[in-house]
Curated annotation (Swiss-Prot):
InterPro entries in the cross-refs: Ribosomal_bL20, RIBOSOMAL_L20_CS, Ribosomal_protein_bL20_C
Job description of the protein: Binds directly to 23S ribosomal RNA and is necessary for the in vitro assembly process of the 50S ribosomal subunit. It is not involved in the protein synthesizing functions of that subunit.
Keyword DNA-binding on entry: no
Superkingdom: Eukaryota
Cell compartments where the protein resides: Plastid, Chloroplast
Molecular function, one GO term: rRNA binding
Gene Ontology biological-process annotations: ribosomal large subunit assembly; translation
Protein name per its UniProtKB record: Large ribosomal subunit protein bL20c
CDD domains: Ribosomal_L20
Species per Swiss-Prot/TrEMBL record: Pyropia yezoensis (Susabi-nori)
GO cellular component: chloroplast; ribonucleoprotein complex; ribosome
Main location: plastid
UniProtKB keywords: Chloroplast, Plastid, Ribonucleoprotein, Ribosomal protein, RNA-binding, rRNA-binding
Family: Belongs to the bacterial ribosomal protein bL20 family.
Amino acid sequence: MSRVKRGNVAKKRRAKIFKLAKGFKGAHKCLFRTAKQQVLKALRYSYVGRKRKKRDFRRLWITRINAAAHNQGMNYSTFISALKKENIALNRKMLAQLASNDIQTFQTVLETVKN
C-alpha cells in the first residue's frame, strides 16, 4: 500500500479555520484547537443572533408605534385591532417608519382608524 502525504490537505483545513478566526484575540487566533472551538462557538452565536434580530426589531417597531399612538391618545393594541377591522394592510415596520419619519401621514392613518 502506498503512503499518502496529507500536508496540503491538512494545511488547507487549518487555513480555512484560521481565516474564519481572523480578528479573534490571543490564542483564539493562533492555536488551531482553540481557534476551531471559538469559530464553532462564533458560528453558533451568529446563527442564534440572526433569529434574535427578527424578534428585537419587531419589539422596537411595536415600541415606536405605541409611543406615537399614545401621543394621539390611543394605545397600541386598540390601534392594531382597528387597523385589522378597517382592512388597512400596513405592517409594523411600515407603521414604525411612518411614526418616526413622517408623523403627518401616521396621524392621517390614526384618524382614519379612529373614525
